[in-house]
């Protein structure tokens, strides 16, 4: 039991059941009852109920009185939840899903960059610049490119000083773990430092229109790389 779920039994059970739901394990059979889960994994009733409660809050499950617990359709899932998004990318990863995510980024990050150009503080400028420096270091083998790229994009979201845009940070970070690995692989293991620098420069200069355009160009480049990665699947 401890080995199966790690040190936190509730989160371990949540992750196991969440992945099973996302991969479609219960598409053709009922979701197990509370008693069945307890028996199968040797865990307490309180741990089981808490894990199911967490999955219900994420939109994956629905409990009906005297009928049991059911898996909800995918359109009901909270795709903005980092756990749900991670399970989707881990268990059901597809280029189409990544493409949809980057299309969402086109509607969020350019506007966040424009707001950052108007509102960012000197400290937030420094955070964006630090992310860019880490990317340069990563190209020289002195830092992790994935962490650097995520740090840059999260810093821009925070610099928007808009609470709603900032809420996208965990979702963006989670999905970029997959997206950046794919696009950097297609690009030969490098990120486009120049396009990231253009975003940074526009924000520091206070040019909202240029910041918006530069971020849009950066994300569009990622979409182009995804299309290149998709070419072998079409042949």
What are these regions (language model features)?
Residues 53, 117, 137, 157-161, ...:
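Amphipathic alpha-helical interaction elements
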Residues 73, 100, 124-127, 164, ...:
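Residue-level recognition of specific faces of alpha-helices
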Residues 132, 136-137, 166-235:
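C-terminal all-alpha effector/ligand-binding and dimerization domain
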Residues 25, 119, 139-143, 163, ...:
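Residues at alpha-helix boundaries and short interhelical turns
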Residues 34, 161-163, 206-207:
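Short loop-to-helix capping motifs
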Residues 1-107, 114, 233-234:
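Short linear motifs at protein or domain termini
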């Amino acid at each position: 039991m401890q080995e199966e779920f790690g040190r936190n039994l509730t989160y371990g059970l949540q992750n196991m059941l969440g992945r099973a739901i996302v991969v479609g394990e219960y598409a053709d059979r009922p979701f197990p009852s509370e008693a069945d889960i307890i028996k199968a994994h040797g865990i307490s009733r309180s741990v089981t109920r808490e894990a199911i409660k967490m999955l219900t809050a994420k939109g994956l499950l629905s409990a009906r009185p005297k009928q049991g617990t059911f898996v909800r359709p995918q359109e009901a899932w909270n795709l903005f939840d980092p756990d749900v998004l991670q399970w989707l990318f881990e268990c059901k990863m597809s280029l189409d899903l990544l493409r949809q995510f980057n299309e969402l980024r086109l509607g969020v990050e350019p506007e966040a960059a424009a707001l950052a150009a108007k509102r960012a503080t000197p400290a937030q400028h420094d955070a964006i610049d630090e992310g860019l420096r880490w990317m340069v270091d990563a190209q020289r083998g002195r830092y992790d490119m994935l962490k650097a790229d995520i740090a840059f994009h999260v810093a821009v979201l925070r610099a928007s000083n808009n609470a709603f845009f900032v809420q996208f940070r965990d979702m963006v970070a989670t999905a970029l773990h997959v997206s950046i690995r794919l696009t950097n692989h297609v690009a030969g293991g490098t990120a486009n430092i120049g396009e990231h620098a253009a975003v940074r420069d526009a924000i520091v200069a206070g040019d909202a229109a240029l910041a918006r355009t530069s971020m849009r160009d950066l994300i569009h480049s990622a979409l182009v790389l995804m299309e290149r990665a998709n070419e072998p699947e079409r042949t």
